[in-house]
Amino acid sequence: MQGMKKLFIETLGCAMNSRDSEHMIAELSEKEGYETTNDLSSADLIIINTCSVREKPVAKLFSELGVFNKRKKEGAKIGVCGCTASHLGEEIIKRAPYVSFVLGARNVSKISEVLHKERAVEIDINYDESEFAFNDFRTSPYKAYINISIGCDKSCTYCIVPKTRGEEISIPTELILREAQKAVKGGAKEIFLLGQNVNNYGRRFSGEHEKVSFSELLRRLSKIDALERIRFTSPHPFHMDDEFIEEFSSNPKICKSMHMPLQSGSSKVLKDMKRGYTKEWFLNRVQKLRAMSPDVSISTDIIVAFPGESDEDFEETLSIMREVKFDQIFSFKYSPRPETEAEHFTNIVDEDVASSRLTTLQNLAVNILDEKNKTHLGKIYRVYFEDLNQDYYASGRSDNNLLIKVKGSDELLGEFRDVKITDIGRTILSGEIVG
């Protein structure tokens, strides 16, 4: 649109940050007349939406800010949003005085307000956005990310999220259903539900609302006629009761892909982390899940070298990896975060030992993945296509979250096709359309 102001936004971290960025784009477009651009040097407003789960993204923030400040055009504003904004607040402006405003992860709806204030810092983690009606914007016309809760009530000793996103509040069911219906009317055939602990949905609402469990929410969403697929992240192993597993397994619209954040295979370490479950509970849930849904793919998160992790504890983690054979593993060395309980733990694992353990774990993960990928060769999967690259390969995901590409055109985008796997790679499978 002629004369519209330009917005450049970079998003770091999780899917919830991606959805927050979509919310900010919608607000700035509707209320302030901005349109997005991929050209930083032409932008009138530059936003970096940050992550603070580990130390590395925080360090990256100030590196990126320096680059942005050098490349921005005269008069352009720079804003810092998200979890690091919530955590560091005014310190960001002290360290980078060219930053125009700082907006916390719990205050996304105030983006237009802070934009017009000089060096504004808005980081109230108790601010309630659970009933705020955001204007609609989606980066993909084929899939809709939908928040079902904000914040987190867990007290994991390593995690800073409760300090940056506040207490957990469920978004009213009627708002979620309305957003899903609107997305489907707009052409989306898949919705992706977001929350820190999605299967704890319904525990607390900010107002008087019908108490609906996560399993019941899934049932209601699946009644939307043109909606074909439902995904979600992340469920907490502690809340994986039988009702949830049964609904997941029996509901044909729910994709058979589950992210189960293990964090450690040692019950002792899990207790130190205050995860709320044991190794035995986790394995029991996996066994129940696979008994009811044999083709389910299971991904996980693992932290190595948590304070006090012994060689025996680490071996227990490797053992559970061999037993479960996760389809994907996101693994990290423990990174102490400020204002967390574990920051004060003194039994720190030696850095060389930590690095060695991470390498060992990742090598095992690759071996497991390579073996599992071989089993896909020759099989047929129903793929929902969402992307087309410049070489005219269309890619999408199967029900169990395999990333699959075929030679094709934009006519495949937003469509389902049966694909026979003809070649396997570590991160993407290749195939040909059949039928």
From Swiss-Prot:
CDD domains: Radical_SAM. InterPro entries: Elp3/MiaA/NifB-like_rSAM (IPR006638), Methylthiotransferase (IPR005839), Methylthiotransferase_CS (IPR020612), Methylthiotransferase_N (IPR013848), Methylthiotransferase_N_sf (IPR038135), MiaB_methiolase (IPR006463), rSAM (IPR007197), rSAM_horseshoe (IPR023404). [4Fe-4S] cluster 2 binds at residues 152, 156, 159. It is found in: Cytoplasm. Residues 374-435 form the TRAM domain. Its EC number is 2.8.4.3. Residues 138-372 form the Radical SAM core domain. It comes from the Bacteria. Residues 5-120 form the MTTase N-terminal domain. Its cofactor is [4Fe-4S] cluster. [4Fe-4S] cluster 1 binds at residues 14, 51, 83. Keywords: 4Fe-4S, Cytoplasm, Iron, Iron-sulfur, Metal-binding, S-adenosyl-L-methionine, Transferase, tRNA processing. The keyword Transmembrane helix does not apply. Pfam families: Radical_SAM, TRAM, UPF0004. This is tRNA-2-methylthio-N(6)-dimethylallyladenosine synthase.
